[in-house]
Amino acid sequence: LEGANLAPEELIELLAPLLSTPPIFIGILLLVALLIPMIEEAFKTLGVWLLKGRGISPAEGFVAGMFSGAGFALVEGLLNSATVASSTSTDWLGFVVGRLGGTLLHIFNGGLLGWAMANAWQGKKPAKVVGIYFLTVLLHGIWNGLAILELSPQFIASGNLTYIFLAVYALILLVAFVLFSRKVERQAAGSTN
């Protein structure tokens, strides 16, 4: 395999016997849907921490977190683009759905954590940061778990079912993002009156 430039479909076909083994698939799922989100969500909003002593409002924390999430999504998108560009894959639908949903996820999760941190810094329920962190890990883990389903032999046979799941989940995230953004906006307007 050294120097091989395999498309994701070719790699999946090559690894299918291993992936059909439940312990291996569960191990991959735990890594991708739990460990990676825990690490990414812990480090994604490091930029917001630089604002700790500045007395930012929860709305400002939300915006700073969204910027941190957008920066993270940009770097991740560039790395994923390089991977797709160097493969023989023609799966642009999967790439586009993955990047759109992934970008929304990173921006929303960054905003949630930034909002929670700013609330905590104002002395309002510091434990909320831990709860929001675990919520963002859950949201991220669901996204990654859905994305990894395409490696499951049962889902390989189902065609574009993974993309449908990802698109529906991205739509749910979009609705949650809009609703939460409106909540933050109302809170900010109420605190300035």
Write out the residue ranges for each language-model feature.
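Hydrophobic alpha-helical segments at protein termini of multi-pass membrane proteins
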Residues: L1-N193
